[in-house]
Amino acid sequence: IEVTPVAANTLPSTLGDFAASTINGTYAVPYGLVPSRDALLIEKQDENGDNPYVNIIVARTADKDNETYKTIVDAYHTQLVAEFLLVNYHETFYPAFEYDADAEFTVTEDNVADLVGYQSSKKDKTVVKVGVCGANNDQWRAVQKVLDDEGANIYIELVEFDAYNLPNEALNSGEIDLNAFQDKAYLNNDAAVHG
């Protein structure tokens, strides 16, 4: 077996050049790949959040007690967002937070497009810039809807990066307020290297 390192965001386009590839959902879904149909192996997801590669939302250490940021995290950890992840990202993204899997879902195949198309106004709201990677970030529209429904007066502005290491740099420099493309393993390594 010959292993060839390739940038994660280019993996789907190289499938014709290799016998197989390890591609995460961030890049597989926009390319039209479906795990149950196209995968040779699917990594088992640990829904209790113990998987060190589950994405988490992080802020700078100085901002760890910021109430606005905590409100965003709380909005992300809602039943509506869990349902959106499950319905919109078939087989690819799973909530790594508690939700009621047995509940009658309000998000369905028939109305998920309404959330994908949800638009909010940033007028008179606190704008929070959230760093993301890849093309699968529509769950943030569901988060925005939760915030708007709660009258939180917060507007989420997504800042998209094309490489996984760039959001950390942008967070550290203050270009973004939160990094939503961060896993525990990478965060621990980055903290060990950069403090």
What are these regions (language model features)?
Residues 2-13, 158-169:
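Short helix-initiation/N-cap motifs at beta->coil->alpha
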Residues 12, 69, 73, 82, ...:
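Extracytoplasmic/secreted envelope proteins and their assembly/folding machinery
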Residues 18-19, 23-29, 135, 162-164, ...:
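Beta->alpha turn/N-cap motifs
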Residues 52-71:
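A bilobed periplasmic-binding-protein/Venus flytrap-type ligand-binding module shared by bacterial periplasmic
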Residues 75-99:
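Periplasmic-binding protein-like
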